[in-house]
């Protein structure tokens, strides 16, 4: 497989929309939504922190320096953008809580502000978040492009969007996935095991994005062409599908087609199951009750079946499935964007957008779908 970055297909077919977006504290805000309510009792203080111009790891370093707490004692649910105004929850041993208020000015000097203090019985761990609320401000937006953007947002609010990994997974030079493959091939290795694991996960992410783009291509072909033309297409690709199945696929109202053997999952979380009744699962997908998942290949990965597996095989890799420390998993192919709000400020030529995404989904994927700009792999959030 070609490891150079290829353009990823969009879900919708509108022309590109021209505007300017700058990932900055003024124009990009991220607010973490916790996975559970905090009990207000327990041995761990839980603080909500607002930061600007700092990565999460830089923020943790500041807390360690000011409070004298070891970084290993600090808990956080996920990494938040540096070039944004963000809020997130941090846990630390209860004994450090009295030092928080005493050091308010020291935190403010570092662009940190503690918004709330609570307590809980366990440390916050990676993944302990429900999702994130986002705010984005687009500039140099004409009234016509604002109208186009609203129309695109209506489609996205109705059907959702592709759950592509954002380019921060792939590094400044878009080559992390190549380094990950070299590690799997024993051509290179780094001293820090976490770095090795991250680079391997970048390769998984690259394959996932490529598979998702391929599935979008197939969905578009099914929708655009007749059953007879589709039969010829699938025959040329050596994919097994009959005319009755193609009729069922064409009748699915959602732009992303559910194929026989897809690994589905109840949305936004739940158990995996195989898509066997295509009409039924297509309707449930349209109602946002379930969603199809894509492969993150690894030793214990769950694989698709039937037609879905025939397509997925191209994006499997025996070095991933045999790598002892790469277990593998599934990731939603598709996510539903919630609480979409927008406002066009004509006198400033600015468009303000608010929305919610579940954990693991990227605001850059939404920006990509709105903007339809070539070379979107340069996004940084």
From Swiss-Prot:
InterPro entries: PsdUridine_synth_cat_dom_sf, PsdUridine_synth_TruD, PsdUridine_synth_TruD_CS, PsdUridine_synth_TruD_insert, TruD_catalytic, TruD_pseudoU_synthase. Residues 160-335 form the TRUD domain. GO terms for cellular component: cytosol. Gene3D superfamilies: TruD, catalytic domain (3.30.2350.20). It catalyses: uridine(13) in tRNA = pseudouridine(13) in tRNA. Keywords: Isomerase, tRNA processing. Its EC number is 5.4.99.27. GO terms for molecular function: pseudouridine synthase activity; RNA binding; tRNA pseudouridine(13) synthase activity. One of its GO terms (biological process) is tRNA pseudouridine synthesis. The active site is at 81 (nucleophile). Belongs to the pseudouridine synthase TruD family. Responsible for synthesis of pseudouridine from uracil-13 in transfer RNAs. This is tRNA pseudouridine synthase D. The lineage of its organism: Bacteria, Pseudomonadati, Campylobacterota, Epsilonproteobacteria, Campylobacterales.
């Amino acid at each position: 497989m070609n490891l150079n970055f290829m353009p990823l297909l969009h879900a919708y077919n509108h022309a590109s929309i021209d505007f300017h977006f700058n990932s900055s504290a003024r124009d990009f805000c991220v607010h973490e939504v916790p996975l559970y309510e905090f009990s207000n009792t327990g041995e761990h203080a839980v603080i909500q922190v607002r930061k600007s111009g700092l990565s999460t790891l830089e923020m943790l370093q500041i807390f360690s320096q000011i409070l004298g707490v070891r970084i290993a004692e600090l808990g956080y649910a996920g990494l938040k953008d540096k070039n944004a105004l963000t809020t997130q929850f941090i846990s630390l041993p209860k004994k450090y809580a009295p030092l928080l208020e005493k050091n308010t000015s020291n935190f403010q000097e570092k662009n940190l502000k503690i918004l709330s203090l609570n307590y809980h019985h366990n440390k916050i761990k990676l993944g302990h978040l429900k999702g994130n609320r986002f705010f984005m401000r687009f500039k140099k937006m004409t009234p016509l492009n604002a109208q186009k953007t609203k129309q695109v947002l209506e489609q996205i609010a109705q059907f959702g969007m592709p759950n592509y990994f954002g380019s921060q997974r792939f590094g400044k030079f878009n080559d992390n996935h190549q380094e990950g493959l070299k590690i799997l091939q024993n051509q290179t290795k780094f001293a820090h095991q976490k770095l090795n694991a991250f680079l391997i996960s970048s390769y998984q992410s690259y394959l996932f994005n490529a598979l998702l783009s391929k599935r979008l291509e197939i969905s578009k072909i099914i929708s655009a062409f007749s059953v007879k033309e589709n039969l010829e297409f699938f025959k040329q690709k050596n994919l097994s599908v009959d005319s009755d199945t193609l009729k069922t696929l064409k009748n699915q109202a959602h732009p992303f087609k559910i194929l026989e053997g897809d690994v589905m999952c109840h949305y936004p979380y739940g158990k995996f199951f195989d898509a066997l009744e295509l009409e039924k699962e297509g309707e449930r997908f349209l109602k946002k009750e379930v969603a199809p998942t894509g492969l993150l290949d690894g030793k214990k990965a769950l694989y698709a079946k039937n037609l879905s597996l025939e397509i997925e095989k191209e994006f499997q890799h025996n070095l991933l499935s045999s790598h002892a420390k790469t277990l593998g998993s599934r990731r939603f192919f598709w996510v539903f964007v919630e609480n979409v709000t927008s406002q066009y400020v004509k006198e400033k030529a600015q468009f303000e957008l608010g929305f919610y995404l579940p954990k693991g989904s990227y605001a850059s994927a939404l920006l990509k779908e709105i903007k339809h700009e070539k070379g979107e792999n340069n996004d940084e959030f």
